[in-house]
Amino acid sequence: MKLCHAIFSTFVVFFVASGAGEKQGESQLQQIYDELSILSRVTNAIALQAAALSKTVKIREVITELLKVDNGNFSNLLSLDPAHLVKNLDELHKKSLQAVSGSNEQLQQDLKEMIAMNGLLAAVESENYTEKATVNSLIVLKKVDEKMEICDESLITIMFNISQAMSGVPFAESDEMKIFSSMKTMKKAFYKCISKFPAFMQKLYEYNYPLSGFLELNDTMNTIKALNELDIANKIPNMLQKFKTPFLNILAVGDHRNKGNTGKLLQSAITLFKKTVYSNSSTRLFLTAGFPESGDMKRVAKDLTSDWFKKKVSRGKSTAELETALKPFNQFAESMAHVFKSWNNFRDDFQTDSALLATIPDLLSQIDDYDRNVDKKKFLENFEATFRTCFKNYKNALDQGEETKFLKNFSAVYLLVRSVQAVEQWASEISTMFDEKAMDVYFEELEKLTPSNIKEQVEKITNFDDFLKIINKFTMLKSLQTQYESAYKTSNSSELSLSKIITDAGLVDTSKCLEKDKLDSSKLLKMLQFMQHMMQLDIDYSTLKANLDNFFELKKKMLETEKLVKGFTSRSARAASNSGSPVLKIKDSQKHADHLGNGLLAIKKMIISLKEKATILKSTMFNAKANQEIREKNPIDYIKEFWTNPGPSIEKLVSDLEKLEQSSKSYRKADLLTIRKVFEDGSKIVGIPEVFSYIDSQFEKKGSQYSNERKITQALSTLDLNFASHKGALSAASLSVDNLKLYFDDLFGLTPKVSVQSESTSPIVVVLICVAIVLVLVILAIVGYGFTSNGRNQYINLYLYYFGKTSDYEKRWRYSLFMDRVDGKNVLIDSVREINATNLLKAVKRGAYINVCNKYGNTALHVATRRGYQNLVEILIKHGADRSFLNPQNKTAEQMIPVNYQETHKEKIERFKSIESIYNKYRKKKFKLCVPEKFPVSSFHIYIEDRTDDNVTNEFTTKFQSITSDEAMITTTHVVVKTTEDGILETDDLNLLIWIFHGSIIVRDTWMVDCLRDEKLIEKDCDYLVEKVKYKGIIYDTVTQWSNAMAKATTPFLYGVHVALCMKNCPYLASLTAIIQGQGGTMLDKFPDKDAFNKGSHPYLHKNLGPIFLLHDGTGDLDLYRSDPDKMFTLFTEQQFMDLLFKREINKDTNPKIIPVLVDEED
């Protein structure tokens, strides 16, 4: 028996021992994560303690990172000192308690009822009942037509049939042929219909104005009913008598209190609370990566004595010295526990009470602003007396039959009013959609249709979808006309009038009396609201006070913790310098803590993903319709591409995670250097790009259509499956484990001592080795320099200078508009203007675009030659300035030397002779252009237009915060715009289009999406350029032409153009002015005098046009200028002018003797 018991005991001990190290239910990878987290926490504690000893710790940043709040907002919060605010609030609350102590729920209810009745009084005061009594629908309806026709019924029928056919309604083949053939013949009827629109719109306005007055009659009727139902004629005087004493007690609080700004102070405090609570910090941990959870810091003390740490790190050696060194950190951890608790209380209570708290500042502001100079008692007595006098003529009786008759007739007239408004809205929408030029294009295309496959031909017409929208809109007209005619017949026999009801009630005399005796219901309203606010403050104060107390407690614990850490830096530093603290022995402890902590966070994401592997695999089994929806309609290109065949990538992800789990089992049993291989294996897992959050958003918009698939995408949308983005963190973590092992081995005396033996070496060998080392070092230095950013750029520039193509230069010249400007001025033009050879030489050597033009179309070489700056001329020629470039006078730079300078410029004779010799000297020589500097990403100023996806925009601005702005600025380099799937910018907004003519680089919104996936693509803006713009239904492909022209500052497109506006209203005046002036034109502030311009002159780049541009809206008579015999005027509508700009067609005046535009223009 004893033998059996011994055998059984031995078996139990063995079983328990063999399973002691395994945590049931946890994966091997999870257990490695838990164990390495011990090392991560200890390392982070050492790093923070070392920073405290060396006085480099940024304790506020450490705490805010632990709390996961924004450091700036939190610091602003702690700087808040609301002591004065609390004092005012306590004082006000005390007075409010005294004032409302005798009040009850009935008083609060009566206050609400008084406010409602006071609103009716205000309506009676302001209403003109004499006028309302004269309104009669039969009189108005005599002026309204029985029918409302604008288009021929045959045209509406054609459009209805086209709409049905295009939407897929089946027709016989012969009928369908007739339907589409009829499109070719409807042009005349369509334009006839459209021509009637101005008169039709005017008629609608004439109908709608008097008819809408009937709606006001209903409001008047509702007021009369309310006056009767509330019985205010008797109730108001009685209530004023009954509650005068408690009212005056409450109102007295305002009289005995100085006017303050309590509401504004509280609003500022709550705004800071809200910013701090609701704005999260960056998810990337830098100082506390070892403590991802709130309780992790307190675990460090136990980590040092844990079995795993003793076995894998200290390997049985005493940890007492390290425990002693980290005692101050443990005190910090204890103090932080109180901070966490205070923060959680503050955050949770504020989130619960935020809606209520948001209403209190306004309530307090109204109390602060209350008028204390009114004699309340006298006012209430006068109010009651005036009310009784005026309402003695009022009869509180409403005839039931009259009311029923009114409501019946109102329903009939109301249908007519709504019918007219519906037609008016339809006409307004059609007018907005209609574009004459685009319609001409559609009808031209329709006339080309042939009988065979006519529907397919129609569908291929460019932008036919826009035409179809107009057709669909017209199909609504028939039903709108029918509704109108039906409503007219019903209402035409219905007399709508309030004359008898108003007369019977005596409202005319009552309202006149109220107006004459100045009842002043608005002042009573302010008093009633003040009383309401005081009573409400008594209810809300406890919530407000609790939140303020939470804040004070949080601030107290924060300051105590910061003071504790500052104490460590003063006392501990002296002790550490004498004893040699072990926490100071490791180099870059903070870096290792950062790398190891963030590497483990990446492992944690893999663990979470591994738990969801079944759900991940289900995503490969979506039905065909859902897959097609993603491939064809997801707004993000890379997701469409990925979902063409997502299965292999997703299955490989799951397979890689399972392999990592399998290898973790063997790693756990080995030493630290073997365990770290989990990071190396993890870094090889690529994963998949972020797709599920975007797909989930796509499915969410479809309602229940993809409910089964959405359960999967919802579950996966929170997972980070793009493990390739964590490769750097995992690799860094692996290297940090190596360094940490060396540190701990040295700390615990585990490093083996190496014996050193001396050997004699030949001096010749030593010399040869030294020479070889020097040569190797020189070669390595040259090669190594090439791996630095400066070296790489310099080597690339050398290559481009000797072997580069024009296209290579063009890629960099795209940024010349921004690279070559200082304080908004081009550095070349400015250097010549200032005669600054030093700055000019610096600019050309760093590759500034050398043929840039000033606003007069002259290059720097033209200006330098014209002014006789021979040293500047030589610098420009020797650095590749184009000597054949023609300015707007069709002169080369050399031709800018005055012909008779010996007579006209005697003081510059030597200068011009020197310049002539320079041109002769280098006439047959060509010079290379210097390589333009690469425009750094850090100098990007990116502005994102409002129509882009809000989620993508917010993520992008967060990720690239330093180079993005939510404000448009003169320094903006890139403008991200919403484009179609074809990459076309569609907009009629000149405030957005102005960026094209400003010279900013216009990029598609898909750039943001791809940059979020791979931030290196921020440098590849050239792959996302917008090349086409659709304005007023027409597509133009000159966007990049404008960018390049502005980058190189070519001859201004509108040089010699003088613009005058002939419009009653120009909503885009500021944008048009900026475009015109930016392109070298002149915006005139008054109508031009033709005599000030030379006959026969033209803008330099538009010899086919007159120099005076008149922009008009088509309303004025401009035939005199249109038929000008001298062809000095060119007339444009705003759209035609933009068409000129977008086409960017140039007709250069090649005449060697250009006629100046202005009579007094200088050469």
Curated annotation (Swiss-Prot):
Q: Where are the ANK repeats?
A: 856-885
Keywords attached to this Swiss-Prot or TrEMBL record, sorted alphabetically, are: ANK repeat, Repeat
Question: Where do the BRCT domain residues begin and end?
Answer: 929-1025
Which PROSITE patterns does the entry link to? ANK_REP_REGION, ANK_REPEAT, BRCT
Q: Which InterPro entries match?
A: Ankyrin_repeat-containing (IPR053345), Ankyrin_rpt (IPR002110), Ankyrin_rpt-contain_sf (IPR036770), BRCT_dom (IPR001357), BRCT_dom_sf (IPR036420), WSN (IPR003125)
Name of the protein described by the UniProt record = Ankyrin repeat-containing protein F37A4.4
- Organism, per UniProt? Caenorhabditis elegans
